[in-house]
Amino acid sequence: MPAHPPIKTVAVNTWDFLRKPMIAPTGFREYDARWKYPDEINLPGMQALGLGIGTQMHEMGVPPHIAVGNDYRDYSLAIKYALMTGLSQAGITCHDIGPALSPMAYFSQFHLDLPAVAMVTASHNPNGWTGVKMGFEKPLTHGPVEMARLRDIVLAGEGIAREGGKIIEVDGVMDAYIADLVGDFKLSRPLKVVCACGNGTAAAFGPKVLEAIGAEVIPLHTELDYTFPHYNPNPEAMEMLHDMADAVKQSGADLAIGFDGDGDRCGVVDNTGDEIFADKMGVIMARDFAALYPGSTFVADVKSTGLYASDPVLKAHNCTTDYWKTGHSYMKRRVHELGALAGFEKSGHYFLSGDIGRGYDCGMRVAVEVCKLMDRNPDKSMSDLKDALQKTYTTPTLSPFCPDLEKYEALEKIIADLEVHAKEGGTLGGQKIKEIVTVNGARCQLENGGWALVRASSNTPNLVVVTESPESDAEMRAIFSDLDAIIQRQPNIGEYDQMI
């Protein structure tokens, strides 16, 4: 029996809010679903989403079994139960793995031999957000095609109820996940590591994993607290990175590793307190992997440094890098398609495959691999490994506000303006635009090897801006200033989340 279409405007504190599904259509993103709760979705709406996911599973011929987990937010458990109610209504058996990291949920597909996964999480979004990451083909998660079809099923009320659904509570997945991460590896050198969790879900995992491999752990906000009393756990944000840097300086640690709210991303600070942006950390890891697996293919997202293409160590080991669309689902799929050894995103998603991972993004797996890297270089510090890279000057990820319903149109106009600017011989930071790559937004390649990127965020009402210079901090800032002047021509651009 088909469902009724949900109400597309959420009316909080009304009679219907407690009974009828209400879902803002903007929550269906390119590769997952995210809403402000309860302003953009209610619990009956989440039940309708579960019914839609279950209906899509039947439509795609996926066996009716799914792993379901939730992150550590005060409302995530209620949302998970609503989602599982809808999945069960669709005739799906839900294997409830309990509170989890997103990569633990992905791991559970392999551990429990299940075809599908649904993880209730808002990822690194701040409190007040919720969402679901889902996938029907391990280790992959939904991309734009699957998300568009899911959106249509849910918003048109095409979910179909079936018999046979149920919920099974599964214990032991967390212990199995940690054991899988640790394996038989033990550090052979002393290593003092600041473990930064921002009081998010990773606090239940990070210290245990690092201690199990023999690291001396310096805890930083490793108490579970869903109010996030210090800051939102996001290792791409300078606030968290600065806190990690201060902890390194105060403790004399060898490095700091920080995790986001659902543990699929991580960030690194070296022994001097320098923040290593995730794309640069990826080059350090790629160099290490290249020596172990020469001839490997890597994937980097379009926000990442140009060093993947120019690094002499990667070239010496006959390694190649494919630049691809930003987004965890895009990157997972690209790594899978190319048979790449690893993929790296500037946001801190790393996709380790082949002999070093299963292809999904797992901050805990990366933490272990970073420690292994240090173990393979016993005479070097993290700053030594960082300083061995060619020096470039890169902004953090900068995100000006732009409404969800307007950001893609605004981006198209910005790209058109950039193309005219380039055609007329215009410059960014005094450097002529050599090429504009539009695989994901616009990445302007400059004559001296610098670049500037503007794209639309897939997860939040923002654009995303990054610039890099091989010459100087001043040129990096000048590139940003010139790009921002073009961006600001659009009337619907708001304030940046952070500035350089």
Region locations from a protein language model:
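Gly/Ser/Thr-enriched, mixed-charge loops and adjacent short helices
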Residues: 17-23, 130-251
